[in-house]
Amino acid sequence: PETIIGIGTGSTVNFFIDELKKYKNLFKGAVSSSNASTKLLNDSGIQTYNLNEVLEIEFYIDGADEVSKDNYLIKGGGGAHTREKIVASAANYFICIVDSSKLVNQLGAFPLPIEVIPESRSLVSRKIVSMGGIPLYRSGFLTDQGNEIIDVKNLDISDPMNLEMELNNIPG
């Protein structure tokens, strides 16, 4: 088998990897979105690859923190947001595993995690406040890339695509 799959991060994915190891002979290996998932995959006997080593990722499998009725997601609560986005964007298909507890009418009950370069945390936080958000620095936590996480409450997420664009335009 030549298929490479992408694997996300978090408690749901940990359960998935535990089941996936039974089928490890049906695919070549996986690209992971975090060091923790890479370790779990390797411990399960599943070959892992760096994204730069593969030409194609067939499926990206991950969980979500919230899912709206319109299938918009809040992801990144596990702190691997940047790599999750990168690996997911490289895949042909995205498979999101959630249970009914993650389904919401309106996104925003779960804080929106935003990964920031450490030097820009204060600037990004001020911009978020100007948008109506309440940023909370996730103290003592660094991503695998050495970045920090700001968990944001109180943002209007009625237009998730526009909000994502606004947030992505904040330097840092």
Which stretches of residues belong to each language-model region?
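Conserved phosphate- and dinucleotide-binding cores of soluble alpha/beta proteins
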Residues: K39-G172
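N-terminal active-site beta-alpha-beta segment that forms phosphate/nucleotide-binding
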Residues: P1-E66
